[in-house]
C-alpha cells in the first residue's frame, strides 16, 4: 500500500497542478468489517490532460479511433512516455497496476477526466458523460491480499 500511495502522491504533486504552488489532494481510509478501503483524490488536471504524446502516437491513435479508456489503460501499461520526458520515468502508474495485478490490493478503480477504469473488471471501464477535474483512486486491502503479499517471491 505504501508504494502505491507514494506513487499517487508523487504524481499528484508533480503533475496535477504544474502551474500552481498549492497542491491539493485528499487521502482517506475507511475500516470495514473484513477490509480496509482507501481513496486518494487530487484536484489537478487529470492523467489524460497531462499526457504528452509523441506525434507518431497522436497519429496512430487518431487513425485507429482509439478512445480515452484505451489510452488511459495504455498509460498504466507504460505505452506512453512520461510528461517529464525523462528516460528513467514512467514507472509509477505501471507499478500501481502491477500491485493490483499481483492482487496485493483488490478492486482498484480510477476516475480521471472522462474515464472510469476498473482494473478488477475491465468490462466495467467506460467513458463518462461528465469530466472529473483531477484523479480519483479507490482500492481495498483484505486479509487475502495481505497474505498474498506476505507469501510473495522476493
Would you name each region that the model predicts?
Residues 52-53, 152:
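Short coil/turn segments at secondary-structure boundaries
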Residues 62-154:
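Flexible, glycine-/charge-rich segments associated with ATP-binding catalytic modules
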Residues 53-55, 124-125:
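Short, glycine/charged-enriched secondary-structure capping and boundary segments
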Residues 30-39, 54-59:
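Short beta-strand-loop-beta element adjacent to the nucleotide/active-site pocket used for signaling
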Residues 26, 35-37, 134-136:
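Broad gene-expression machinery/nucleic-acid interaction feature
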Residues 1-32, 93-102:
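Conserved ATP-binding N-box helix of the HATPase_c
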Residues 42:
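Acidic ATP/Mg2+-coordinating residue in the GHKL
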Amino acid at each position: 500500500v505504501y508504494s502505491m500511495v507514494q506513487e499517487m502522491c508523487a504524481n499528484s504533486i508533480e503533475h496535477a497542478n504544474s502551474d500552481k504552488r498549492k497542491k491539493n489532494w485528499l487521502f482517506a481510509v475507511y475500516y470495514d468489517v473484513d477490509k480496509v478501503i482507501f481513496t486518494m483524490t487530487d484536484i489537478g488536471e487529470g492523467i489524460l490532460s497531462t499526457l504528452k504524446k509523441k506525434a507518431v502516437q497522436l497519429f496512430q491513435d487518431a487513425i485507429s479511433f482509439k478512445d480515452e479508456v484505451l489510452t488511459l489503460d495504455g498509460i498504466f501499461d507504460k505505452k506512453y512516455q512520461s510528461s517529464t520526458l525523462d528516460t528513467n520515468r514512467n514507472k509509477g502508474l505501471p507499478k500501481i497496476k502491477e500491485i493490483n495485478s499481483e492482487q496485493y490490493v483488490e478492486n482498484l478503480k480510477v476516475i480521471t477526466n472522462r474515464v472510469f477504469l476498473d482494473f478488477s473488471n475491465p468490462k466495467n471501464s467506460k467513458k463518462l458523460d461528465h469530466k472529473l477535474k483531477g484523479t480519483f483512486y479507490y482500492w481495498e486491502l483484505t486479509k487475502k491480499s495481505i497474505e498474498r503479499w506476505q507469501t510473495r517471491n522476493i
